[in-house]
Amino acid sequence: MCIRDREYGVRFTVKGKTAAADISGEIDAASSHRVPIIGLYPGEDNTVVLELLDDSGRVKDSQEITITTEALPESLTDVIEPVETSGESAYDLTMVYGQRTHLPFAYDCMGDIRWYMNKETGNYGLYMLSNCRMIWQDTAGYVPNLEKPQSTNLYELDYLGRAYNMYYLSGGSHHEVIEKEPGGNLLVLTSSMQSHCEDKVEEIDRQTGAVVNELKLQDIIKCKYENLVDWAHINTVSYQPETDTILLSVRNLESVIKVNWTTKEIQWILCDPRFWEGTDYEKYVLKADGDFIYQFQQHTAYQIDTDLDGDDQTIEITMFDNHFLWRRKKDIDYYDKTEESYLLVYSVNEAEGTVKQIKKIPTVWSKITSAAIYEADSNHFFGMCGHVANAENGWKGMTYEFDYDTEKVLNQYCLKKTFYRAEEMRIDYNDLASPMELDENYIKGELWQPVKTWKWLWNKKPDQVLPADTLTYNITGKVLYIGTYDHQISQVIFKGAKNTYVYDTTEVRLHMETFLDFYENIPVPLQGMNADNYEIYVMYQDGFYDTQQTFAIN
């Protein structure tokens, strides 16, 4: 869009089926514009109004255009349906992603899809950033784990699909990638691989991808509950700069735990006291102020800034209480199977070591995943139920928007597929309108490296040749991706004339047969290997094979 005589701002409006469903965005003043349009209906002729704005925001000129779009892909057809709607929402657009919702999408207040990404995400989907971009969990690379394989490749992406940075995570990622502070380092949930999984937090330098701090939960908690591979199952982490603490939602310990991020000292534990009774950690458990039932296998536990109880001596913690018991049934004989989930708010007096439950709103029973989100500007409380149990008509997900004070349902939508989370689609239209700029070092972090070994250890060429269609091979940049089903390969040997390297996952032993059906592309970095002509051998299903694949590093 070109304006010759002076600089103007631009506002676009995609006309909705109702006035409240209009989607608008503004671009700062300039003499020419690239106008990103978000909010088009799929498979329709969309009316879009473009307006020129002067310095005072007055409309100086306008034009109406029509944009025709393609229909939704089959996987998103009829994926959402309103149960009840007030006709307006605190969110212009709500994004849904992860689990079986492989293509993220956003819907409006009427339950109509207005945006989607035609690229699949990993199991946990994406994570919003303060700059209105997202960290995208990619499907290109997975590292074997003790249970579920974990995605190693993360992208900083905008809503137009432009990738600005790429982060490699050697141990893979799960459940949470969140900024420590706006624009700052990333806190990532990963796995220690030391007989346990989904039990580790890493702080990733935003500029380099290097790990600058970490916490393995078994370093601060040692007790009888370490008896499971997935003993902790951390699903949320966030940072409180005023106290230099992180808040962890530890699902399989039924606990929300606050830890000093520098000293790694436990500050307190929010949990039913009976769970920690008789252990060294019962002294950290907050004392109940009042009579209430605690959470079971919670998700999205966050400390919020809003003072919801009118007491400046307390902090508020919101969470989604799945109220489901899958692990440790023998340890928890007090579980009340209500077959409901709940949006909870706790008020914590840290000085006195007490906790009070100040809000409890029931939702449909969602056994895993899901999210609770308090929206301060509207005073609305969102319940994003990602894995609904026993739903009528086979629906797998449900989202709610409540008035916080009255607990009245303002909007409710059912979804055909399970999802990991749903949240507001926050958009910076000026960022989307800007030409894409890449940092010189836009690939950051590192993967598990092949280790150089003695040449004589692998002098003997394998007697067996692996059938050509058993594995797939693809080199992207300086990374070799080997496609296979989970835990079929334990070693990859790169045999050169002068150098030999081994990529070894032998010690990563699978504990759940379910994931043997998971097809993954194992990322093997090549940039640290010496110049040579290499043959690729593999230990495949405990057999030593020649793949008859070769490559050269010059």
Model-derived regions: residue spans:
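Conserved small/polar residues in nucleotide/adenosyl-binding loops
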Residues: 1-5
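Histidine-/acidic-rich catalytic cores in large beta-rich domains
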Residues: 7-9, 34, 38, 45, ...
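Extracellular low-complexity, O-glycosylation-prone stalks/linkers
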Residues: 9-22
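Short beta-strand segments within Ig-like beta-sandwich modules, predominantly Fibronectin type-III
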Residues: 24-31
